[in-house]
UniProtKB/Swiss-Prot annotation:
Compartment(s) where it occurs, according to its Swiss-Prot or TrEMBL record: Cell membrane
Lineage, broadest ranks: Eukaryota, Metazoa, Chordata, Craniata, Vertebrata
Protein name (record): G-protein coupled receptor family C group 5 member C
Family matches, as InterPro entries: Bride_of_7less, GPCR_3_C, RA-inducible_GPCR3
Species this chain originates from: Mus musculus
Residues with the Phosphothreonine modification: 422
Gene Ontology biological process: visual perception
Length: 440
């Protein structure tokens, strides 16, 4: 009899403790020792958690790399107007990084800390991003009309002040909510009877959306402010306005979809379990919109010089002084080389080799035309004075029996001067150029 009673008690234990077995049952992909709070991070049956954290992890890495690139490109930014926006853009990247991190708080099951972080950081992080867009749009409206905008610290201060407004709103809302209900929440997120509708996890979906009205106002301001930038006089700033406009249009579409789903769709289909996936997907989608349509295009444009700087670079190119430059200038001067085959003998002192660097003083050299004797002879009498025209050779200027039979330029010049001093009989000066190597 005792054996039968013991057997019945062992078989009846599972019937009396079904809750204990249910608590030890872990979803596929999760360890039995894992806290049930983190089951969505590894649950393969509901893949939305794994996909969301994978997308958020890739976004965190991408945003971190883009932040490093933007900060490292600061010394290479030549346009001072773009450099003044770097502080605001880094602030925008920090807000985007926070949105990717907040995705994990939405994947984890509701708890007092996770619910409080969602309620507070959701609006603050979006306010950071949209405030930076509003400040950028404000600067672009000045740049497209005057090609000169506010200082960098002014733009950053505008973005910071707009963000502080949302910080104050969320802080007051969260404090009032917690103090009024005492914040009594069970470890698994089950709200006690004394704190119903007063804890962060017990806030209605409609109330959560209503607390984001200021953030929606910032988004609408950035969207409307981006349109005038497309009509400015300075067209090179229009593409930045297009980046902001495209980002805000997609963000508005994302916000409309998730708000409708969060406040109306889930209640109509009686699926409150889709509240967390809705927030996680909205965060990841909007953060990637910021990265793809605003951050990456702005980073690619930040180091490009302004048209004024490009024009100055073309007008005043950098020119180095070196051996190659001297050779090019000497080559340019060699186009007027004297033909030595038809030149007369010159004194030996004139034939000394001259260094190509003797006349170089560090400045740009110019080619100087030095005509030869043959060129002067072919110019004619009307182009120069009579005393520079080379004389013709005569039989009286040189003794045929001398040892040196070469005509010297000095003797020819003396004979020619004598002939010029004796005018012709008709009283006119006539210049007859004869071959100096043919005797009269």
């Amino acid at each position: 009899m005792a054996t039968h009673r013991t057997l019945l008690m062992c078989l009846g234990l599972p019937l009396f403790f079904p809750g204990a077995l249910a608590q030890n049952h872990a979803p596929p992909g999760c360890s039995p020792d894992l806290d049930p709070l983190y089951y969505n991070l590894c649950d393969r049956s509901g893949a939305w958690g794994i996909v969301s954290e994978a997308v958020a992890g890739a976004g965190i890495i991408t945003t971190f790399v883009l932040t490093i690139i933007l900060v490292a490109s600061l010394p290479f930014v030549q346009d001072t107007k773009k450099r003044s926006l770097l502080g605001t853009q880094v602030f925008f990247l920090l807000g985007t990084l926070g949105l990717f991190c907040l995705v994990f708080a939405c994947v984890v099951k509701p708890d007092f800390s996770t619910c409080a972080s969602r309620r507070f950081l959701f609006g603050v992080l979006f306010a950071i991003c949209f405030s930076c867009l509003v400040a950028h749009v404000l600067s672009l409206n000045f740049l497209t009309r005057k090609n000169h905008g506010p200082r960098g610290w002014v733009i950053f201060t505008v973005a910071l002040l707009l963000t502080l407004v949302e910080v104050i709103i969320n802080t007051e809302w969260l404090i009032i909510t917690l103090v009024r209900g005492g914040g009594q929440v069970s470890p698994l997120g089950n709200v006690s009877a004394d704190s119903t509708m007063t804890s962060p996890c017990a806030i209605a979906n409609m109330d959560f959306v209503m607390a984001l009205i200021y953030v929606m106002l910032l988004l609408l301001t950035a969207f409307l402010g981006a349109w005038p930038t497309l009509c400015g006089r300075f067209k090179r700033w229009r593409k930045h306005g297009v980046f902001v406009l495209l980002t805000t249009v997609i963000s508005i579409a994302i916000w409309v979809v998730w708000i409708v789903m969060y406040t109306y769709g889930n209640e109509q289909h009686h699926s409150p379990t889709w509240d967390d996936p809705t927030l996680a997907i909205a965060l990841a989608a909007n953060a990637w919109t910021f990265v793809l349509f605003y951050v990456i295009p702005e980073v690619s444009q930040v180091t490009k010089p302004s048209p004024e700087q490009s024009y100055q670079g073309d007008m005043y190119p950098t020119r180095g002084v070196g051996y190659e430059t001297i050779l090019k200038e000497q080559t340019g001067q060699s186009m007027f080389v004297e033909n030595k085959a038809f030149s007369m003998d010159e004194p030996a002192s004139a034939k000394r080799p001259v260094s190509p660097y003797s006349g170089y003083n560090g400045q740009l050299l110019t080619s100087v035309y030095q005509p030869t004797e043959m060129a002067l002879m072919h110019k004619g009498p009307s182009e120069g004075a009579y005393d520079v025209i080379l004389p013709r050779a005569t039989a009286n200027s040189q003794v045929m029996g001398s040892a040196n039979s070469t005509l010297r330029a000095e003797d020819m010049y003396m004979v020619q001067s004598h002939q010029v001093a004796t005018p012709p009989k008709d009283g006119k000066i006539s210049q007859v150029f004869r071959n100096p190597y043919v005797w009269d």
